[in-house]
Amino acid sequence: MIDKTQYRKFYKNIRNSIQHDVVLNKSRLICNELKMIEEVKHSNAIFVYLSYGKEVKTDEIIQYLLSKGKKVLVPKCNIDTETMIPVEIIDFSQLEIGSYKIREPIVSNEYFGRIDLAIIPGISFDRFGNRLGHGKGYYDKFLEDTNICKIGLCYSDCLSDKKIPCQDTDIPMDYVITDREVLKLWFFILTVHFAKLKFCEMREGEIC
C-alpha cells in the first residue's frame, strides 16, 4: 500500500512540473468556479489561505471576496505549536513574509467571530474529499470541532482517483474544485458519518 509520504512526493513532483503560465490559467478557472458556489455567495466571513509557490493562486479570490463586502480571514501561523489563527485583512498591504516564507498578516489580532466557510490548499485531494497536505496538521487542527463549509482547491493534475490514506484526525472537504470539475462531497460525508453511527448502535456498548 502506498503511504502518505509517497503520495506527497508523487503529487508534489506533478505540481512542481506545471508551468507558471499554466498555473495562472488553471487558478483563474478555479476562481471562476468558486464564485459560482452558493455557499460562497451566501457566506459573510470566509477564511482563505495565502498561496505560495505552485499552489492554486488565491489573490484573485481574495480581491473578489473583498469587492463583495465579505470579511476575509487569512492564517497566521505559530511554528512552535504548529497551529494557526484567523486574522481579518482588508488589503494586501497588511501582509508580510512570515513563517515558512509564506505571506501572513503583520498583526496577530485573532478573529473570534463566526466563520462561515474556509478555502483550503492541498498538494492533492481525492474524490472522497480527503486532503493531502504537508503533514504538519495546521489545517486539521484549525478545522477541528468546527461547522465550517470546507472547500479544497487543487489542479486537475493533482486530483487522485485513488483514496488518499487518512487518519481520524484528517478533516475531509465538503467541496473540491479543480480547473476541470467541481466535486460536491457533503452528501457523501454525511452518508459515511451516519453509516458509522448506525454501525455503532448495532454493537452495544461500543464507543465510536
Residue ranges of predicted features:
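N-terminal active-site beta-alpha-beta segment that forms phosphate/nucleotide-binding
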Residues: 1-113
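Redox-cofactor binding/interface segments in oxidoreductases and associated redox assembly factors
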Residues: 48-50, 120-121, 178
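Flexible, active-site-proximal loop/turn residues at the rims of small-molecule/cofactor binding pockets
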Residues: 52, 124, 182
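A structured binding-face within diverse protein domains that lines the active/interaction site
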Residues: 104-105, 121-124
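N-terminal amphipathic/hydrophobic targeting modules at extreme N-termini
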Residues: 193-202
